[in-house]
Amino acid sequence: LRKHNISGKENAFDKLVNIFLCKIYDETFNKNNLKFGYFGVMADTYANMQDRLMWLYKEAMKEFLGEKITFVSNEDIEKDFKQLKIKTLKEVMQNYIKELKFYSNNDFAFLEVHNKELFLKNALVLKEIVELFANYKLTQNSTNQFLGNLFELFLQKGMKQDEGQFFTPIQICEFIMYSLPLQEMLSKNSKALRVIDYACGAGHFLNTYANELKRYLTEDELKEHYKNIYGIEKEYRLSKVSKVSSAMYGQNEINILYADALASFELANTNNLEGEKAKPQIESNSFDLLIANPPYSVKGFLETLSDKSKNTYKLFNDDINIETNNSIECFFCERANQILNDNAKAAIILPSSILNKDSIYKNTREILFQ
């Protein structure tokens, strides 16, 4: 990137995450016909390479995060034009132009692209980065600490942490994990534990828990337990980071939901897909363990919730000022009470103010005691 005079680390990191998503999907679903890579000047073009990447990205977002990405592939155009009648030519072209103008985003633009010359400059950068990773396998059947550490390095350098968005250090995640009676919980449950982090950020808690399972379970048992790990993240970029991170650590089965964990269950489970991926995954009283470091002191967060969502909380009442209330940590506590079953455990990092403030904090303490 420095060679090509690209200094925007955050944008570069975002694009790198998208590239990793493409490669992870390709390795998982196209093992016998890999599409990730540049196949040489005699067999490929920059446009075709990016077309394949966009297709992989669309499929990866649908499969891993339940998100629908607008992308018009060469196959889509070929299929429609084969059936085209002259009188519909204008309408079809208008629809394609509308999608490309208003609904698509260049998910692989390390440089700003708004003409052919800039497209070719960016394509050269993209080709070189794709070639860097094409011959390496990102998805593993077992933990690959090197790949995990590599991605952690990219994360620390490429994503700025500021007020309200701090990643939980791995050491803190491990300390909390060691404090839990995990072996006892596993032995008491005949089925895999359903585990959730409802503010998963970059996925540190999820990956630490998944790694800790290796102390108690066989390789055959691990995959089933991974399938019962859920992370919810409201920030779009971080939801993608969490999915890539889990794959890098060899834990690709972990479920990441791009959603607002405080929304009503119907809204939190909504996505643009049909069938199996659209089925609700977060239900009340359905989890055995919650581990999280949710945000705190977020002014006006209630304004982002629908009336239906707000009314699912006992803490919400007419006396609360929706515009100024910042007690988001209290609502995360009540949400924990809603999604955990009667025998569940919760390990949540909270500000000390939850122990001594009055008003809504007093009501939150009552929920915790109950």
Spell out what each predicted region is:
Residues L1-F39, P351:
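Non-catalytic accessory regions of SAM-dependent methyltransferases
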Residues L21, T28-Q156:
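Long recognition/docking surfaces used for binding and targeting
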Residues F166-K277, Q281, N285, L289-A292, ...:
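Conserved S-adenosyl-L-methionine
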Residues K243-V244, L302-L305, I360-K362:
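Short amphipathic alpha-helical segments
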Residues Y296-F331:
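Mobile active-site "lid"/loop adjacent to the S-adenosyl-L-methionine
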